[in-house]
Amino acid sequence: MEKSGVARSSVYHHFGGRDGVIAALETTSTMRSLERGTAEFEAFLDTLTSGEKAFELIELGIRSFRSSENKSMRQRRISSLAASHNSAAIREVLAKEQRSGSDVVARIIEKARDNGLCNPIEPILGVAYVIQSMLVGRILVDISEDPALDAQWEDAAIATLRQILRPT
């Protein structure tokens, strides 16, 4: 803020207060982290010739989202979503980042389809948003603090994605 010459009060006002600024920054930080992860996934996907091998990678990813780091990231995303209720500026940041993230996921699915790794049964952008929704919605399992439920969610998510993506 100092370098830009914008007053702190102006930034706070734009995002609806200090919490809004924090939510916007956390959203941007979270999305950058997700982009790095998807870039690594996409690079590895380029080396695969089997849809089943690609799906094993997806399964591993889903099971790794159980980590405390990923739980914290989901908590921050949910907090940002809640903060957006009272701030058009935060909603704008969230919407932009969500569109960007979903476009990346859609591009990966499209590339996998074009490389013969999967044959999605639904429109690719819709599938990308379903995947994003599943990952954020996992917060419902997180708050239960039940490891058995965590495993059940993972199994159900994997089965759902297998049906939608249809690995070859």
Kindly give the residue locations of the regions a language model identified:
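Hydrophobic/aromatic-rich alpha-helical bundle segments in the mid-to-C-terminal region
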Residues: 91-95, 99, 113-161
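Hydrophobic alpha-helical connector segments
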Residues: 24, 35-72, 124-131, 154
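Residues in soluble alpha-helical coiled-coils and helical-bundle/repeat scaffolds
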Residues: 16-20, 24, 45, 49, ...
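Helix-loop "lid/cap" segments that line or gate small-molecule binding pockets
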Residues: 60-68, 75-86, 160-164
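Helix-turn-helix
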Residues: 1-25
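Amphipathic alpha-helical packing segments from all-alpha helical-bundle domains
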Residues: 34-35, 68-78, 88-115, 126, ...
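Generic hydrophobic, amphipathic alpha-helix propensity
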Residues: 1, 25-29, 33, 37, ...
